[in-house]
Amino acid sequence: MSRFIGSTFKKSRRFGFSILETGKEFSKGKKRITTPGQHGKERAKVKVSEYGQQLQEKQKVKFMYGLSERQFRNTFAKAKKMQGILGTNFLVLLESRLDNIVYRLGFSATRQGARQLVNHGHILVNGKKVDIPSYLLSVGDLVEVKASMKKNEKVLEALQNNEATLEFVKVNKNEVKGEFVRLPERTELSSEISESLIVEWYNRLIKK
């Protein structure tokens, strides 16, 4: 787990964005202006092109949710087929993934850790084992850690340290289970994500 968190901290410093959405990656709650490394180098103030901004935003969100390029692009393609605002639909699909909801419920300190719980068959959805991290939950689905893992030290520690749960999920810490209550609203998700840049990035690729 420490290896995962260490890697996440480096990525957060690279993008100047809290991938864990807690701000703990930055000393004293302030974003560092140095690059990852033992001492770090002062980050040069270089004007980033429109292309560079789009690429950086895509990479930032991709790392945040822990997806491969193929998974990320396939999710975007699925969002394009939905009615409504494309960028918002894209984020809603990312949030509806089983590994993300396991993280949102506080069963793991990181999304990578949540993905491991799912991969190893430790998560039940509506009472049945689901070991596919990309599994898309439906509103009303019940998610819980299987009985043999409910006393697991890392799971309990993550639950204890979980400071806040977003309103689109409901958690019962005593029973180590929760519910995907409703789809998230855009205002509940990070304001530091500019999904319009990601839409522009993929639209650029489609035009080529």
UniProtKB/Swiss-Prot annotation:
What terms describe the molecular function in GO for this protein? rRNA binding; structural constituent of ribosome
Q: Would you kindly state one Gene Ontology biological process term found in this protein's UniProt entry?
A: ribosomal small subunit biogenesis
Q: Which positions fall inside the S4 RNA-binding domain? A: 96-159
**Domain of life from the UniProt record:** Bacteria
- Alphabetically list the UniProt keywords: Ribonucleoprotein, Ribosomal protein, RNA-binding, rRNA-binding
Q: What does this protein do?
A: One of the primary rRNA binding proteins, it binds directly to 16S rRNA where it nucleates assembly of the body of the 30S subunit. With S5 and S12 plays an important role in translational accuracy.
- Share what the entry says about its subunit structure, partners included: Part of the 30S ribosomal subunit. Contacts protein S5. The interaction surface between S4 and S5 is involved in control of translational fidelity.
Query: Which family is this protein grouped under?
Result: Belongs to the universal ribosomal protein uS4 family.
Name of protein = Small ribosomal subunit protein uS4
Q: Which organism is it from?
A: Mycoplasma mycoides subsp. mycoides SC (strain CCUG 32753 / NCTC 10114 / PG1)
